[in-house]
Amino acid sequence: MVREAGEVVAIVPAAGSGERLAVGVPKAFYQLDGQTLIERAVDGLLDSGVVDTVVVAVPADRTDEARQILGHRAMIVAGGSNRTDTVNLALAVLSGTAEPEFVLVHDAARALTPPALVARVVEALRDGYAAVVPVLPLSDTIKAVDANGVVLGTPERAGLRAVQTPQGFTTDLLLRSYQRGSLDLPAAEYTDDASLVEHIGGQVQVVDGDPLAFKITTKLDLLLAQAIVRG
């Protein structure tokens, strides 16, 4: 495969505790059938053939362990107290290097993401879109509710999508979004990177996601992932 011009860097924020999964270690370090989630996520990015460099942000006390697991496959940095801070710290690593053309941000918990999905996001970036997210249509009916549990309405499902990762951006747009967004609202207000782009008025394009790019968050998700990798 001949790689096109313009470097692509993938950031994997993996500094969270993963308390909902309750497996006794940070979620990214949980071994799924003999291989950690972070390892599977990084391998999926590299196997796509469109990612040049991977930067992984982990808890400060796990950096040595991450280096042992990933070896030369990724740069390791200490993450922050929340996802937004963690991505910011990973972006800071890029400031000392030649700026890549594109940056992907990918959840370690989406460890089974097919390489073809990664390539699809990068292809859309190279086609001229500045921000790209993979999505899936919703199958469940969604209700908007208030703090007391009273239903306020039923959004039209046809216009809703479930968002996955990797999310891709031109480097300049992502840096501007983080610089501006981090000043305007608390980091916890942003649940994904595209939200920061939306906040500064940027346009986000969707591409087809993949059911295998589901996020391993609960024990049920873990059982599904185990069944998939064991065939």
From Swiss-Prot:
It catalyses: 2-C-methyl-D-erythritol 4-phosphate + CTP + H(+) = 4-CDP-2-C-methyl-D-erythritol + diphosphate. Signal peptide: none annotated. GO terms for molecular function: 2-C-methyl-D-erythritol 4-phosphate cytidylyltransferase activity. The keyword Cytoplasm does not apply. Its EC number is 2.7.7.60. It is an enzyme of class 2 (transferase). Keywords: Isoprene biosynthesis, Nucleotidyltransferase, Transferase. The record marks 20, 27 as: Transition state stabilizer. It holds the Pfam family IspD. CDD domains: CDP-ME_synthetase. Pathway: Isoprenoid biosynthesis; isopentenyl diphosphate biosynthesis via DXP pathway; isopentenyl diphosphate from 1-deoxy-D-xylulose 5-phosphate: step 2/6. Gene3D superfamilies: Spore Coat Polysaccharide Biosynthesis Protein SpsA, Chain A. One of its GO terms (biological process) is isopentenyl diphosphate biosynthetic process, methylerythritol 4-phosphate pathway. The record marks 157, 215 as: Positions MEP for the nucleophilic attack. Catalyzes the formation of 4-diphosphocytidyl-2-C-methyl-D-erythritol from CTP and 2-C-methyl-D-erythritol 4-phosphate (MEP). Belongs to the IspD/TarI cytidylyltransferase family. IspD subfamily. This is 2-C-methyl-D-erythritol 4-phosphate cytidylyltransferase. The gene is ispD.
